[in-house]
Amino acid sequence: MGVPFFSSLRCMVDLGPCWAGGLTAEMKLLLALAGLLAILATPQPSEGAAPAVLGEVDTSLVLSSMEEAKQLVDKAYKERRESIKQRLRSGSASPMELLSYFKQPVAATRTAVRAADYLHVALDLLERKLRSLWRRPFNVTDVLTPAQLNVLSKSSGCAYQDVGVTCPEQDKYRTITGMCNNRRSPTLGASNRAFVRWLPAEYEDGFSLPYGWTPGVKRNGFPVALARAVSNEIVRFPTDQLTPDQERSLMFMQWGQLLDHDLDFTPEPAARASFVTGVNCETSCVQQPPCFPLKIPPNDPRIKNQADCIPFFRSCPACPGSNITIRNQINALTSFVDASMVYGSEEPLARNLRNMSNQLGLLAVNQRFQDNGRALLPFDNLHDDPCLLTNRSARIPCFLAGDTRSSEMPELTSMHTLLLREHNRLATELKSLNPRWDGERLYQEARKIVGAMVQIITYRDYLPLVLGPTAMRKYLPTYRSYNDSVDPRIANVFTNAFRYGHTLIQPFMFRLDNRYQPMEPNPRVPLSRVFFASWRVVLEGGIDPILRGLMATPAKLNRQNQIAVDEIRERLFEQVMRIGLDLPALNMQRSRDHGLPGYNAWRRFCGLPQPETVGQLGTVLRNLKLARKLMEQYGTPNNIDIWMGGVSEPLKRKGRVGPLLACIIGTQFRKLRDGDRFWWENEGVFSMQQRQALAQISLPRIICDNTGITTVSKNNIFMSNSYPRDFVNCSTLPALNLASWREAS
């Protein structure tokens, strides 16, 4: 959220062997080459012969397009890597480059994305070549034979992503990648796989181009609204009118961001220029894949030059499954609520995060700095570290955690740090109970408990306050047992819908002292001054003042005329970009990039009435003025972007989303629970005594156990927000009793 729920990955410039689906990059390359050689060994028609009729394509043309695609993609990746290394070393990196450094696919994600890039660029090249031969309109994938599509899949490497997946007969713990959670379909919920689609994609050309790509092309008979214009006319409001939420703390917003970073991450392209033409998406407003810039409407309140644009990069494509034709996006993380933001979603990273120097099962901690005697996250060992550039004199690098966005803002870093400390506290206590356990057993048992804690806090404390009691009963009835026919993958639409959290963001980071008074210096730092500022955690008092601020400050209330603050609508990444970004507008552009259907399609999916007229929309929204504004922009409710429509609805009683988002969020979390073999309440995961002990845990108690804070929120930490009324001493909160983890010697 703040940039909460906003994608950002750091680029690792030196890529060693990568794992994806259990195969090293080298193994996958060999398999791909083997597939290509097998194809080349079969007799092929002569090079360059023009097809006699529409529908006949020489396989030689398919192969030459793939080879050309590989050269273009590899060149773009290499140039990008070398350019940013050189600029970071010389200190001349532009703010835009600094930000983009955080958003790259790394390790196994990079391997999976590169294969998909090969495939999509080859199809693009093939279409260009065939267009010069044929005058009639066509979709390139419709004119290729199944055998030729198979050639493309194999020679790109896509066909080999799930080769050789075998699951052990017995498994006590989750895999790091999420692989084998579902024994019948081992890749379901695993990292570096495509999102699931609950409704078919809607692209302008039917398979890849987003609506708004081609000037003049209408959607459902109406012009496509400019995302920035919608943001200006409907989302924008004066910050001094902001309404604080009397029944939600800022921690409610913060848990949403942390949780989102457990569930999904969609990387942006490693190459920041057009593969085919080399146009730079960062500096140019030319629209060529992967650049899909946001156009500026007339009379924009901030950007006066209408020829300018807000930069936007299309999300990385995923290797297609059975349907090679329709573009989908990749989830770099495990879908499951498994604390992957603490432990990682790939094996090499997971090993990197551990302290392997002893048999204590600990996570590695910072060797240079402490926070009042307590551990901080270790620093990442990037050759060129962008966090150093946010405060050149401080020389504080980025942190390393299970999700690469941990340094995005200090509030998020504080939550990562809290869970790191809790893991190490648990591992240490388990060691004293079971002196014979080795480091691996201690690590896995502590990891299992932390994963259960994240599940409990999310489903018991957080989700009821998102959905409200009625939707909670409807979408998340009492847990029965694991069901291996439930698909636990994150839905593409959820990645956009869960950005509802942007409506909760306050424009400041708040820091409070041990009396819950504003902490000097800098008690209220504008959000635009904290992005990527790892130095603020190390040098400005650690995580305690930040956690107090999250507990004792109200979240922003989403109202229909106060949707999102200008700090994220006008000044997002202002310090680190050539132009401040507009997060609500980016959400809308992203839904089009991902081919997500519009508002009414999702209302239909959820069994909700679909308004057709202004009056009907006014009835649904209980706000005719807002309905008129939306219809002015979109022409029809069918075209309203899912995020815009979702956050415009009146909130459900005691919830913080309307009926549509309650359906999408509730449905997703039901699948994540019922389709998880390692769900904490599933029979055989924990003993009955262990489950009873875990039911006592709370986020305030975790804060008590791992910080210098002695007074914390009582009742629900996400609801209480007024000090001292809603606060209690730590001694009144039950601690987790680990007695049932003691093994008989």
Curated annotation (Swiss-Prot):
Cofactor, how bound (note): Binds 1 Ca(2+) ion per monomer.
Gene3D superfamilies, A to Z: Haem peroxidase domain superfamily, animal type
Swiss-Prot/TrEMBL site (Transition state stabilizer) positions: 405
Entries under Pfam families matching the protein: An_peroxidase
Subunit record text: Homodimer; disulfide-linked. Each monomer consists of a light and a heavy chain. Found in a complex with CP and LTF; interacts directly with CP, which protects CP antioxidant properties by MPO.
Disorder: Myeloperoxidase deficiency: A disorder characterized by decreased myeloperoxidase activity in neutrophils and monocytes that results in disseminated candidiasis.
Described purpose of this protein according to its UniProt entry: Part of the host defense system of polymorphonuclear leukocytes. It is responsible for microbicidal activity against a wide range of organisms. In the stimulated PMN, MPO catalyzes the production of hypohalous acids, primarily hypochlorous acid in physiologic situations, and other toxic intermediates that greatly enhance PMN microbicidal activity. Mediates the proteolytic cleavage of alpha-1-microglobulin to form t-alpha-1-microglobulin, which potently inhibits oxidation of low-density lipoprotein particles and limits vascular damage.
Protein name listed in UniProt: Myeloperoxidase
Species per Swiss-Prot/TrEMBL record: Homo sapiens
